[in-house]
Amino acid sequence: MVSTATFFFFVYLTLFVVIGFFSSLFIIPLLGISFVFAIGVVSFGFCSNMSFKMAQLIYVRADAFLKKVLDKMALQTQPAQLQEPQEPLSTLRPVSNPTIPSPLRQTARPSKFVTEEDVIFEPVSAQSAIARSLETTANKAGNKFQLS
């Protein structure tokens, strides 16, 4: 005769095998689908990175080309005539240096920064510092446009 322990062992073994079989029917297909989605994530990430690198290369080349064109255009423009300030000289004050620096260089190429020797005086008025900076930069670059 079979003991109770052996009987329950075979019952539990049968339940374990049956549950394992039915769970593998769900786990293996879901694992395959998960693998397919993981491949998709990696491939789309690669494509995204490559398209970003190509767009970055196009942007850098276009930016360099436009900078060259802008430099050529800046060299071909005529320097603007120096205008006399509308306000009396008593309202003018030095910007940063108490001594008068060298006058503006008429043949200078436009640069990103305005140095101390490029700016002689600025009028004391209610204009903002940004507007005065734009006027100085526009006059220095030789533009014929008036910013006001």
Swiss-Prot record:
<feature type="topological domain" description="Lumenal">
    <location>
        <position position="29"/>
    </location>
</feature>
<keyword id="KW-0256">Endoplasmic reticulum</keyword>
<dbReference type="GO" id="GO:0034389">
    <property type="term" value="P:lipid droplet organization"/>
</dbReference>
<feature type="modified residue" description="Phosphoserine">
    <location>
        <position position="102"/>
    </location>
</feature>
<protein>
    <recommendedName>
        <fullName>Lipid droplet organization protein LDO16</fullName>
    </recommendedName>
</protein>
<feature type="compositionally biased region" description="Polar residues">
    <location>
        <begin position="93"/>
        <end position="109"/>
    </location>
</feature>
<keyword id="KW-0472">Membrane</keyword>
<keyword id="KW-0812">Transmembrane</keyword>
<dbReference type="GO" id="GO:0030476">
    <property type="term" value="P:ascospore wall assembly"/>
</dbReference>
<dbReference type="GO" id="GO:0005789">
    <property type="term" value="C:endoplasmic reticulum membrane"/>
</dbReference>
<comment type="similarity">
    <text>Belongs to the OSW5 family.</text>
</comment>
<feature type="transmembrane region" description="Helical">
    <location>
        <begin position="30"/>
        <end position="50"/>
    </location>
</feature>
<feature type="topological domain" description="Cytoplasmic">
    <location>
        <begin position="51"/>
        <end position="148"/>
    </location>
</feature>
<feature type="transmembrane region" description="Helical">
    <location>
        <begin position="8"/>
        <end position="28"/>
    </location>
</feature>
<dbReference type="GO" id="GO:0044877">
    <property type="term" value="F:protein-containing complex binding"/>
</dbReference>
<keyword id="KW-0749">Sporulation</keyword>
<feature type="topological domain" description="Cytoplasmic">
    <location>
        <begin position="1"/>
        <end position="7"/>
    </location>
</feature>
<comment type="subunit">
    <text>Interacts specifically with the seipin complex FLD1-LDB16. Only a fraction appears to associate with the seipin core components, suggesting that it may be an ancillary subunit of the complex. Found to interact with many mitochondrial and peroxisomal proteins.</text>
</comment>
<feature type="region of interest" description="Disordered">
    <location>
        <begin position="83"/>
        <end position="110"/>
    </location>
</feature>
<keyword id="KW-0551">Lipid droplet</keyword>
<comment type="function">
    <text>Involved in lipid droplet (LD) organization. Functions primarily upon nutrient depletion, facilitating LD consumption by lipophagy. Required for correct LD distribution during entry into stationary phase, where LDs accumulate at nucleus-vacuole junction (NVJ) contact sites. Involved in membrane interaction in a manner similar to those of SNARE proteins, binding to partners present in mitochondria or peroxisomes. Its partner on the mitochondrion side might be TOM22, a mitochondrial outer membrane protein, linking lipid droplets and mitochondria by protein-protein interaction.</text>
</comment>
<dbReference type="GO" id="GO:0005811">
    <property type="term" value="C:lipid droplet"/>
</dbReference>
<dbReference type="InterPro" id="IPR031430">
    <property type="entry name" value="Osw5"/>
</dbReference>
<keyword id="KW-1133">Transmembrane helix</keyword>
<keyword id="KW-0597">Phosphoprotein</keyword>
<dbReference type="Pfam" id="PF17062">
    <property type="entry name" value="Osw5"/>
</dbReference>
